[in-house]
Regions:
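Exposed alpha-helical structural elements
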Residues: 6, 10, 63-67, 99
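Intrinsically disordered, low-complexity regulatory segments enriched in Ser/Thr/Pro
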Residues: 28-95, 124-125, 144-146
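Acidic, proline/glycine-rich low-complexity IDRs
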Residues: 1-4, 75-146
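Hydrophobic, Leu/Ile/Phe/Ala-enriched alpha-helical segments that form helix-helix packing faces
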Residues: 11-15, 19, 68, 72, ...
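Long, contiguous N-terminal structural blocks used for assembly/anchoring
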Residues: 1-48
Length: 146
């Protein structure tokens, strides 16, 4: 079983290897809470699902929103599909990948209260290669289809 530190290291490594056009979605198995990443030619975009898309009992609430904002996430707005978001110019340094993973884990663990990485699944594909599936074993998560 993958624990949070191993998952964090694996996620940083896998993000560093994403090709332009890649989309990676990490979602709560059987749920609707997720983190998503999109690699462009010149930036890496990340988002966490916003309250607009969550059932009342799964919403971040004021304290969760405060944690996300303090971590560096930008507040949801209509231009970012009402999700929490952040973007970094690419390429990123290894430390910047670790920093990004750190704020993603604040969302998944502390705000969404996902107990362990085993409660997550992922899907990944490359929009610039005919939506070809990407297999990312370094995540230590089960892969699901689109």
């Amino acid at each position: 079983m993958t624990e949070w530190p191993e998952f964090a290291a694996g996620l940083a490594e896998q993000l560093a290897g994403l090709p332009a056009g890649a989309i990676l979605t990490i979602v709560e198995a059987g749920g609707s809470r997720y983190a998503q990443f999109r690699q462009f030619d010149d930036l890496l975009y990340a988002e966490l699902v916003g309250d607009e898309w969550l059932a009342t009992e799964n919403r971040t609430g004021d304290s969760g929103a405060r944690l996300l904002a303090e971590a560096g996430w930008r507040r949801p707005d209509r231009y970012h599909t009402d999700n929490w978001w952040i973007e970094y110019p690419w390429p990123l340094t290894p430390q910047r990948y670790r920093d990004l993973v750190s704020i993603v884990l604040i969302g998944l663990r502390r705000v969404f209260e996902i107990a362990e990485p085993a409660d997550l699944v992922y899907n990944a594909w490359n929009t610039e290669d005919g939506d070809r599936d990407l297999v990312l074993p370094g995540l230590g998560l089960r892969r699901v289809s689109k």
